[in-house]
Amino acid sequence: MPANPWIFAALAAVTALAPACDLGSLPAVPVAAGAPVRLLVLPEAGRSAVLDLLAGAQASLWMDMYLLTDEDAIAALEGRARAGCDVRVTLEPAPYQDEGANQAAFDRLAAAGARARWATPRYTYTHAKAFTVDHARLVVMTLNLTGAGLAGNREYVLVDDDPADVAAAEAALAADQTGGQAGAAARVVTSPDASRPALTGLIEGAGSSLALETEELTDPTVVAALIAARGRGVGVTVVWPGPAAGAPSVFLSLAAAGIDVRALDGPPVHAKAVSADGRTAYVGSANLTPTSLDHDRELGLALADPSVAAALAATIAGDAARGASPSP
């Protein structure tokens, strides 16, 4: 896939301004280094950026997906299954409390020969949005495979070819197919076991800057950690979907603490991403809510990767500049 020149331009601008940071300033929860990871920013990257990853599978395509309704995405999975690819898809039975939302995709995938499974009731929701390709590539997304996710919302995608990350993700995906459980991993972080410490570790470990873009933010521990970070001199930016008028009290409280809080009207924010000090980052499916962190199946990547973290920070800064401050 061709590189996105906008990302590299943004990265260059932010990297030039990023302060030096030694290993001692990394988060309290270790964020492991590893193979380079590519960041895709949607909607700018276009829906084909994700669809091409699906269509490129030859031997295997394993997936957890909260909501699968996009015709092109379903067709890509059907096509891979009919071509003999080992397609395994675990779907949430009731996304947005709608028990029929994923039924058409489930039926079509099963008819095409894929191993379609409903997610275990072990979790409140299986909210993950991730897949592996040919046991060699991990794709972690903030988006559901819907029309809005692929072509309308502010979303992020990490494309990761690190073998350890792929293996860890596949252990989780395989467990979700059978209702089992997988062990801990270094960079692949899942709810309900690891998302909370990974995300609070990123926030608590920040030394100079924090940039967050999130659809939902209600968790009291996360809110307290953000306010504490601002109290120790960290510049904190939070972008959420808004609207700015009549903002929830949590965003008014963050703004009162000196945090730069911005409501973005468009593109609609469905992202779940954190950049700390322009050097460490989280991208994944976890919203900053108690349910998402403690009760759902979520999957994300927490990593020490300045290229990803700086590009995230640049995108969030651009969104913040176009956003509005919250008001009661």
Label each region the model flagged:
Residues 7-8, 292:
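Hydrophobic alpha-helical segments involved in membrane association or supramolecular assembly
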Residues 314-328:
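Short, low-complexity, Pro/Ser/Thr/Gly-rich segments in the mature regions of secreted, periplasmic
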Residues 9-18:
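Bacterial N-terminal signal peptides
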